[in-house]
Amino acid sequence: PGMVTKYFGFLCNYVLLGFKETNSYLKNCKTIFTGTPLREQFYKFNFLPEWVPKGNGPLLIVMGGSQGAKAINQILYESLEFLIKKQFRIVHIVGESNLKPFHVKNSKNYIQKKFTNEIAALIQNCDLVISRSGAGTINELMEAEKPSILIPYPYSKNNHQEKNAMILAASGGSVLINQNKMSKEVFEETLERIFKIKSKKGKNHYEILDLMKKNMENNNKIKSKNEIKKYIDYFLKEF
């Protein structure tokens, strides 16, 4: 929770929580878990944008928040030839100030953008998200039931990004890699493990990725927009 909520929440009748786990930090407050409101796009299905690379390879969405993330960008650049060789399709959201020409010879499977307004469509239709772990991103991944590799911003206040990432990692829906542990080798080995093909009843599938998807489906989520409205209406009548 933020400092205002942490120190003055006890004065409120109730504090509405984005994560159940936040309750342990607000022991003197009455709390209700509602989830966090998201952009409207996340509450409906969106088709994959036409500009996304076509093909049968797994689709990765790599992003670092509105300002991008230089550490994530750098690892992606270092591993790009490996990813293309493995037939991944990559949409790389680099952030406003980080766009630069970067091409892999003879490949149309990599697209770089400063930002996009179609992030819901990308997350809903991709196979894996690689990202920082701000609260908004965590809730978007939960709503879309999407597996991820999360690399928390190491200088976030009270290390909250790592705590956010631990929620999904503990559920088995995400792999958490701290930035100081991240390297080209660790990144590539993690992807190879997640996308290792296993045969079952004559059909090939990604065993680890499928398990991560199932774990994300089991995560608690609430349509928070309606849930919060319900409590606001109730409190207005009561008080």
Regions found by a protein language model. Name each.
Residues 221-239:
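C-terminal alpha-helical cap of glycosyltransferases
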Residues 124-139, 146-147:
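Acidic donor-binding loop of glycosyltransferase active sites
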Residues 43-131, 162-166, 170, 177-187:
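Donor-nucleotide binding loops and adjacent catalytic segments primarily
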Residues 10-11, 121-125, 143:
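Alpha-helix C-terminal capping/helix-to-coil transition sites in glycosyltransferase folds
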